[in-house]
């Protein structure tokens, strides 16, 4: 009788896990569709952040990559609006850039902590480094923007992120502190 209960418990446990994985895949594919259509990006970001609240997903590369893709799409939409002189919430634009950097740093730290193979870590670092380096100047611009608006906390946060990202492992191979001209 005990053996049957244990077997039943194991079956229910596996069934619950498989349902959770199926729901996760469904949510990720739904978010990818939102990214393609470029609509409801705030909702897409919230879906991915809710997935990351579950400890089972914290080491899931797909969830982190999809969250980064959502933030990147929001950045690209804001950048396009600014370039075409369309109305854009500049505060939201700069805060989104900071979030993009924070997500990349957090994901990199989780990969290192999870003892993933160095080849896999380097591959994702290179992917993120190229994107982050092309937008890094906007951290500085955002910091100056917030300081001019007398929002010193946000300004300091963006400028601090601009400085510290140069020493982070994602971008450290580019030797930014040595290349900086004063």
Name each region found by the language model.
Residues 1-34:
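Bacterial Sec-dependent N-terminal signal peptides
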Residues 5-8, 42, 154, 173:
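Secondary-structure transition/capping residues
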Residues 18, 77-78, 172:
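Generic macromolecular interface patches on structured domains
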Residues 21-28, 122-141, 173-182:
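TPR-adjacent "capping" and linker segments in tetratricopeptide-repeat scaffold/adaptor proteins
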Residues 35-154, 160-163, 167:
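Post-signal peptide N-terminal segment of secreted/secretory-pathway proteins
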Residues 155, 162-182:
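Solenoidal tandem-repeat scaffolds enriched in leucines and small polar residues
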């Amino acid at each position: 009788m005990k053996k049957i209960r244990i077997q039943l418990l194991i079956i229910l446990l596996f069934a619950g896990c498989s349902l959770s994985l199926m729901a996760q895949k469904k949510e990720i594919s739904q978010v990818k569709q939102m990214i393609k259509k470029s609509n409801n990006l705030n909702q897409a970001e919230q879906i991915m952040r809710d997935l990351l609240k579950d400890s089972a997903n914290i080491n899931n590369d797909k969830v982190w990559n999809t969250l980064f893709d959502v933030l990147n799409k929001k950045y690209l939409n804001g950048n396009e609006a600014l370039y075409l002189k369309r109305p854009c919430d500049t505060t939201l634009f700069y805060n989104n850039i900071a979030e993009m950097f924070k997500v990349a740093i957090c994901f990199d730290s989780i990969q290192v902590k999870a003892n993933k193979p160095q080849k896999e870590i380097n591959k994702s670092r290179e992917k993120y480094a190229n994107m982050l380096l092309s937008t890094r100047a906007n951290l500085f611009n955002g910091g100056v923007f917030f300081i001019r608006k007398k929002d010193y906390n946000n300004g300091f946060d963006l400028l601090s992120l601009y400085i510290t990202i140069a020493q982070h492992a994602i971008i450290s191979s580019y030797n930014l502190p040595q290349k900086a001209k004063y």
